[in-house]
Swiss-Prot record:
Official protein name in the record: Ras-related protein Rab-11B
SMART domains according to UniProt: RAB, RAN, RAS, RHO
Cross-referenced CDD domains: Rab11_like
Membrane topology: Lipid-anchor
Role according to the record: The small GTPases Rab are key regulators of intracellular membrane trafficking, from the formation of transport vesicles to their fusion with membranes. Rabs cycle between an inactive GDP-bound form and an active GTP-bound form that is able to recruit to membranes different set of downstream effectors directly responsible for vesicle formation, movement, tethering and fusion.
Entry's family note: Belongs to the small GTPase superfamily. Rab family.
Positions contributing to GTP binding: 20-21, 23-26, 37-38, 40, 42-43, 69, 124-125, 127, 155-156
Catalytic activity: GTP + H2O = GDP + phosphate + H(+)
Record gene name: RAB11B
Note on domains (UniProt): Switch 1, switch 2 and the interswitch regions are characteristic of Rab GTPases and mediate the interactions with Rab downstream effectors. The switch regions undergo conformational changes upon nucleotide binding which drives interaction with specific sets of effector proteins, with most effectors only binding to GTP-bound Rab.
Cofactor entry: Mg(2+)
Organism of derivation: Homo sapiens (Human)
């Protein structure tokens, strides 16, 4: 059945954020269990699921966290974001208000999460083409302006769901790998330590990627 769940080289925590009803839970279940529930109700509290993928011969275990987007769950934000190295910021392409709220979610993410977290903007429910309210080009331009990656998905018909999660996990892995190489070069040693200090390029203007500057000496 492939790699056992307890065997992995890296463990990355990725959080799903965005308004309630945009399809976060179904993105999670589609990627981790290949399931979709048309009757799914708003998530109560927090839940997470895991799935492992292979990147460059390494086993990457993703621990993906999902919480409801309603305001009353704001109290859990600190614990929810703690330790996250990636985030999927999800909106519904058929509901413009969920896209308008992306900016607020992005601010909350940057207030609570590590400043170097990798963020992907996800326009979900791309199967609802006839109801589209958010132009793809508009969302892509917003993502570029805010240094986010961007993709449109459909949890219902599986379009780009694998790609969304695998792309963000691969991006995190590349950054971690470069950080390890840079650290070893800087210290001129390779201390067999499995604890990875993750430093990713900044997602906000005006910040410098301090931890990666040692690469310039290579």
């Amino acid at each position: 059945m492939g790699t056992r769940d307890d065997e992995y080289d890296y463990l990355f925590k990725v959080v799903l954020i965005g308004d309630s009803g945009v399809g976060k839970s179904n993105l999670l279940s589609r990627f981790t269990r290949n399931e979709f529930n048309l009757e799914s109700k708003s998530t109560i509290g927090v839940e997470f699921a895991t799935r492992s993928i292979q990147v460059d011969g390494k086993t990457i275990k993703a621990q993906i966290w999902d919480t409801a987007g309603q305001e009353r769950y704001r109290a859990i934000t600190s614990a929810y974001y703690r330790g996250a190295v990636g985030a999927l910021l999800v909106y519904d392409i058929a509901k413009h208000l969920t896209y308008e709220n992306v900016e607020r979610w992005l601010k909350e993410l940057r207030d609570h999460a590590d400043s170097n977290i990798v963020i992907m903007l996800v326009g979900n429910k791309s199967d609802l083409r006839h109801l589209r309210a958010v132009p793809t080009d508009e969302a892509r331009a917003f993502a570029e302006k805010n240094n986010l990656s961007f993709i449109e998905t459909s949890a219902l018909d599986s379009t780009n769901v694998e790609e969304a999660f695998k792309n963000i996990l691969t991006e995190i892995y590349r950054i971690v790998s470069q950080k390890q190489i840079a650290d070893r070069a800087a210290h001129d040693e390779s201390p067999g330590n499995n604890v990875v200090d993750i430093s990713v390029p900044p997602t906000t203007d005006g910040q410098k990627p301090n931890k990666l500057q040692c690469c310039q000496n290579l």
